A protein has these predicted regions:
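Short beta-strand-to-coil "C-cap" segments at the C-terminal boundary of structured domains/repeats
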Residues: 123-125
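Catalytic core of non-heme Fe(II) oxygenases with the double-stranded beta-helix
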Residues: 23-96, 106, 116, 121
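A short coil-to-beta-strand element that immediately follows conserved catalytic motifs
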Residues: 14-24
Length: 125
């Protein structure tokens, strides 16, 4: 199911190849941990699967990759003209995005005793 969905994404973005999983890793963010803004070079698409997400343990934040926003500021901000866009992490949420898209993970500020946010990140060529 996952690779069928990824194949659809590849095709829709003009790639005539099967997705190839190149690497993956686990992220364990304890209270006050966060991930600085970064991208994933040498990949076409990246993804994250949230496994364990305590309340207020941080969201993934994507930054608009172009500078148009700085020159043509809209009167109303919405999901089509954002400078940054965040998704609230929740268990079993699987997010696929272009690897060039800069993103970060906000600070884990949970008050839950079991405070670790756990996710699995993937890169596909």
């Amino acid at each position: 199911m996952l690779f069928r969905s990824l194949k659809y994404i590849y095709t829709e973005h003009g790639y005539n190849k099967d997705p190839e999983l190149t690497n993956y890793w686990f992220n364990i963010n304890k209270k006050y941990n966060y991930n600085n803004e970064h991208a994933h070079p040498f990949s076409i698409f990246s993804a994250v699967l949230y496994v364990k997400v305590p309340k207020d343990s941080g969201n993934i934040v994507f930054r608009r990759p172009d500078v148009a926003y700085h020159y043509t500021r809209p009167d109303v901000n919405n999901s089509r003209n954002y400078l940054s866009y965040w998704l609230e992490a929740e268990p079993n949420l699987f997010v696929v995005f272009p690897s060039y898209l800069f993103h970060s993970v906000s600070q884990n500020l949970t008050d839950e005793k079991d405070d670790e946010r756990i996710s699995i990140a993937f890169n596909f060529a």
